[in-house]
């Protein structure tokens, strides 16, 4: 259920804005999206896992805040990220 280090490194390499980038909003949103998708699949089979559902809602809220920050700061980066991840916005 947790994101492996290899997959996290792949996401960082794909969405980084410069060579040593690990904490830009793009990277954080990409990692959160991957975790949200994994947790969503888990909750489809385990419908009564309310602890994980609460964690999912917290992650979705955190991603929403990061996307709002990015949209206010730089609209083109925001649009590129949403298109690349296939998010509804």
Curated annotation (Swiss-Prot):
Pfam families referenced in this protein's UniProt entry, alphabetically: Ribosomal_S15
GO molecular function, one term: rRNA binding
GO CC terms in record: cytosolic small ribosomal subunit
SMART domains noted in UniProt: Ribosomal_S15
Record keywords: Ribonucleoprotein, Ribosomal protein, RNA-binding, rRNA-binding
Organism superkingdom: Bacteria
Record PROSITE patterns: RIBOSOMAL_S15 (PS00362)
A GO BP annotation: translation
InterPro entries referenced in this protein's UniProt entry, alphabetically: Ribosomal_uS15 (IPR000589), Ribosomal_uS15_bac-type (IPR005290), uS15_NS1_RNA-bd_sf (IPR009068)
Matches recorded under CDD domains: Ribosomal_S15p_S13e
Family: Belongs to the universal ribosomal protein uS15 family.
Subunit and partners: Part of the 30S ribosomal subunit. Forms a bridge to the 50S subunit in the 70S ribosome, contacting the 23S rRNA.
Protein function: One of the primary rRNA binding proteins, it binds directly to 16S rRNA where it helps nucleate assembly of the platform of the 30S subunit by binding and bridging several RNA helices of the 16S rRNA. Forms an intersubunit bridge (bridge B4) with the 23S rRNA of the 50S subunit in the ribosome.
Protein name: Small ribosomal subunit protein uS15
Organism: Shouchella clausii (strain KSM-K16)
